[in-house]
């Protein structure tokens, strides 16, 4: 967590935005809304179904590429993903760099019956209760963004609300920290959030060192079925795909192609 990185800049904005939201809706109110929300869906069951799971992302923009897609109706896009066979829908809710919002999360949650991931830079318990209040079943925790005590605390809080934590890593050291914190679902992001550079060998280096009981998700760099199959061969249980879907012109078909490849008899099987 060195100063001056892209990640640091994003986190500065997130802190300001969380403080602004909490000034309008306090933690007690958000906790009450989270408690009143429908029970979270079973994410682990979705990830353990046969084949490579596809997590399809509602993603308007990114720090590395800028604007990606004009998504006027996130619910319609999410439904197309679900119809294509996506097992989980990921929704970016960070506004400054990704043009996402909690309104997007609300729209998607109302439109689909599969689990929904809140994809954001979570640094505060407030965001976890907020995610639950808005219907998230799964929440992203980024190891590079958190000190170890905060990671452990936020992971525990996520699970105490019945949600599942997707704990994201980019290095072997971060993977060790994720395991020490008790992560049962680990995402290996090929993109270094501090520099935005892609390392496509990142997953194949880190995944073999993860215990067999841990769900392994490959993040970033999935451009099509060949990438899915490569990640499957390296031990992936699931792939998270955003840019490749929102820029495809046929999101339902693009998801369906990945799902077909991930469930084909020739596809390498996850080591569960």
Curated annotation (Swiss-Prot):
Recorded metabolic or biological pathway in which this protein acts: Amino-acid biosynthesis; L-tryptophan biosynthesis; L-tryptophan from chorismate: step 4/5
Catalysed conversion reaction: 1-(2-carboxyphenylamino)-1-deoxy-D-ribulose 5-phosphate + H(+) = (1S,2R)-1-C-(indol-3-yl)glycerol 3-phosphate + CO2 + H2O
Recorded family membership: Belongs to the TrpC family.
Name assigned to this protein: Indole-3-glycerol phosphate synthase
Listed HAMAP family: IGPS_A, IGPS_B
Record EC number: 4.1.1.48
One Pfam family here: IGPS
UniProt KW Amino-acid biosynthesis keyword: yes
Source superkingdom: Bacteria
Keywords of this entry: Amino-acid biosynthesis, Aromatic amino acid biosynthesis, Decarboxylase, Lyase, Tryptophan biosynthesis
Cysteine disulfide links: none
InterPro entries for the chain: Aldolase_TIM, Indole-3-glycerol_P_synth, Indole-3-glycerol_P_synth_dom, Indole-3-GlycerolPSynthase_CS, RibuloseP-bd_barrel
GO biological process terms held by the UniProt record: L-tryptophan biosynthetic process
GO molecular function: indole-3-glycerol-phosphate synthase activity; phosphoribosylanthranilate isomerase activity
Organism, as annotated: Mycobacteroides abscessus (strain ATCC 19977 / DSM 44196 / CCUG 20993 / CIP 104536 / JCM 13569 / NCTC 13031 / TMC 1543 / L948)
PANTHER family: INDOLE-3-GLYCEROL-PHOSPHATE SYNTHASE (PTHR22854:SF2), TRYPTOPHAN BIOSYNTHESIS PROTEIN (PTHR22854)
């Amino acid at each position: 967590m060195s100063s001056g990185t892209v990640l640091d800049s994003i986190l500065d904005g997130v802190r300001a935005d969380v403080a602004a939201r909490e000034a309008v809706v306090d933690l007690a109110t958000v906790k009450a809304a989270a408690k009143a929300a429908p029970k979270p869906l079973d994410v682990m069951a979705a990830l353990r179904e046969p084949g490579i799971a596809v997590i399809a992302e509602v993603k308007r923009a990114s720090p590395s590429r800028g604007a990606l897609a004009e998504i006027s109706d996130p619910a319609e896009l999410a439904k197309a993903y679900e119809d294509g066979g996506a097992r989980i829908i990921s929704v970016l809710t960070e506004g400054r760099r990704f043009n996402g919002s909690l309104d997007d999360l609300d729209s998607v949650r109302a439109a689909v019956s599969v689990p929904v991931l809140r994809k954001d830079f979570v640094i505060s318990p407030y965001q976890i209760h907020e995610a639950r209040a808005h219907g998230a079943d799964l929440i992203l925790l980024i190891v590079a963004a958190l000190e170890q005590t905060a990671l452990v605390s936020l992971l525990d809080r996520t699970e105490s609300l019945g949600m599942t934590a997707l704990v994201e890593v980019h290095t072997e050291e971060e993977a060790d920290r994720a395991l020490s914190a008790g992560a049962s679902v680990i995402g290996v992001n090929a993109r270094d959030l501090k520099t935005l550079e892609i390392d496509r060998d990142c997953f194949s280096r880190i995944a073999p060192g993860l215990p067999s009981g841990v769900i392994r998700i490959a993040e970033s760099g999935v451009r099509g079925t060949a990438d899915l199959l490569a990640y499957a061969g390296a031990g992936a249980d699931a792939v998270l795909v955003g840019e490749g879907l929102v820029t495809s012109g046929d999101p339902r078909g693009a998801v369906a192609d990945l799902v077909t490849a991930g469930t084909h008899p020739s596809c390498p099987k996850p080591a569960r």
